[in-house]
Amino acid sequence: MRSSSKQEELVKAFKALLKEEKFSSQGEIVLALQEQGFENINQSKVSRMLTKFGAVRTRNAKMEMVYCLPAELGVPTTSSPLKNLVLDIDYNDAVVVIHTSPGAAQLIARLLDSLGKSEGILGTIAGDDTIFTTPANGFSVKDLYEAILMLFEQEL
């Protein structure tokens, strides 16, 4: 029970730090947590927590790259479907454009990149809430669009 309470305190402190302060590296987050009394924290633990809570690196108003939690979503978890993060998918002759909730584009783009060329994805470019995806050789933009639509429908 004691360790789960320490874990809850760590999670609470971690989320509060990401909301209140700007961190440009995982090392800075480690130091801030250590200053709050979490001696056993290290970079790999912080990296896992960033992934678990859907934190992304994005540019703030001063154009600095900082870690943040997706603001409007609360925190996506492994039980929340990624489909909820995708707001719209459309295409033209060159690219498929995916609009996401703020802060979620990099998470979705990483998923798409992991599928790779065999699934028709040559690559992605992600901003804060928009992703451009281009098809690999042998795939049309429409094929890629339909594959992405099916992928997010299956996430229900």
UniProtKB/Swiss-Prot annotation:
<dbReference type="InterPro" id="IPR020900">
    <property type="entry name" value="Arg_repress_DNA-bd"/>
</dbReference>
<dbReference type="Pfam" id="PF01316">
    <property type="entry name" value="Arg_repressor"/>
</dbReference>
<keyword id="KW-0055">Arginine biosynthesis</keyword>
<keyword id="KW-0678">Repressor</keyword>
<protein>
    <recommendedName>
        <fullName>Arginine repressor</fullName>
    </recommendedName>
</protein>
<keyword id="KW-0804">Transcription</keyword>
<keyword id="KW-0238">DNA-binding</keyword>
<keyword id="KW-0805">Transcription regulation</keyword>
<dbReference type="GO" id="GO:1900079">
    <property type="term" value="P:regulation of arginine biosynthetic process"/>
</dbReference>
<keyword id="KW-0028">Amino-acid biosynthesis</keyword>
<comment type="similarity">
    <text>Belongs to the ArgR family.</text>
</comment>
<dbReference type="GO" id="GO:0003700">
    <property type="term" value="F:DNA-binding transcription factor activity"/>
</dbReference>
<dbReference type="Pfam" id="PF02863">
    <property type="entry name" value="Arg_repressor_C"/>
</dbReference>
<dbReference type="InterPro" id="IPR020899">
    <property type="entry name" value="Arg_repress_C"/>
</dbReference>
<dbReference type="InterPro" id="IPR036388">
    <property type="entry name" value="WH-like_DNA-bd_sf"/>
</dbReference>
<comment type="pathway">
    <text>Amino-acid biosynthesis; L-arginine biosynthesis [regulation].</text>
</comment>
<dbReference type="GO" id="GO:0034618">
    <property type="term" value="F:arginine binding"/>
</dbReference>
<dbReference type="InterPro" id="IPR036251">
    <property type="entry name" value="Arg_repress_C_sf"/>
</dbReference>
<comment type="function">
    <text>Regulates arginine biosynthesis genes.</text>
</comment>
<dbReference type="GO" id="GO:0051259">
    <property type="term" value="P:protein complex oligomerization"/>
</dbReference>
<dbReference type="InterPro" id="IPR036390">
    <property type="entry name" value="WH_DNA-bd_sf"/>
</dbReference>
<keyword id="KW-0963">Cytoplasm</keyword>
<dbReference type="GO" id="GO:0005737">
    <property type="term" value="C:cytoplasm"/>
</dbReference>
<dbReference type="GO" id="GO:0006526">
    <property type="term" value="P:L-arginine biosynthetic process"/>
</dbReference>
<dbReference type="GO" id="GO:0003677">
    <property type="term" value="F:DNA binding"/>
</dbReference>
<dbReference type="InterPro" id="IPR001669">
    <property type="entry name" value="Arg_repress"/>
</dbReference>
